[in-house]
């Protein structure tokens, strides 16, 4: 349509009767920021557009988030105790200049057939959602916060009533948000969260600082303490990625973005 509107053909009769068809790009899928799997169903959230669902392990796909207030998806989770309950955190988490903000957390109780916004609209960018293994109404959200402005609606939030109310259970500072939250596979009261000091400015990007680090809670998120014991600290620590080995749940791996080579 843009081509037809902007170009004048010297010999229009050459294309009379031809039908327009999409020819590409076909190999550019954009930014995939969230994946959740429940049986044969796979959910994929794109940073630049929509939540997609496959019911046949990825053979075919369809969008299921077209009519909501935000199109950038940063997190998606399926309730382990009820696979019809889906949670989506909007606002992508790459935090680039082109990163789109979201409109909070959305929930579906019918497998994605319908959605409702359940709050945290001012969190802007959500990095992770974890749902309690036995209670689909209890969830934790890692919110990064506004990309360009220091704000307080960031950190880890918890709901115990399906999103009707939220409690900010981990807050570090107006420039430090939470980009990840991980649950211990054998103990849902043990949670780990990644705090990330980040602020994008018009002329450059601050993506590291002393506020970045890993926190742990042993009581379902009510209280947190920062972990040390070998993890890098200081002005040059950036984003951290966490992973727990399910076959050996006392083993955790951390990938640290550090501007100090010896960290």
Label the model's feature ranges.
Residues 2-263:
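Beta-propeller blade termini and top-face loops
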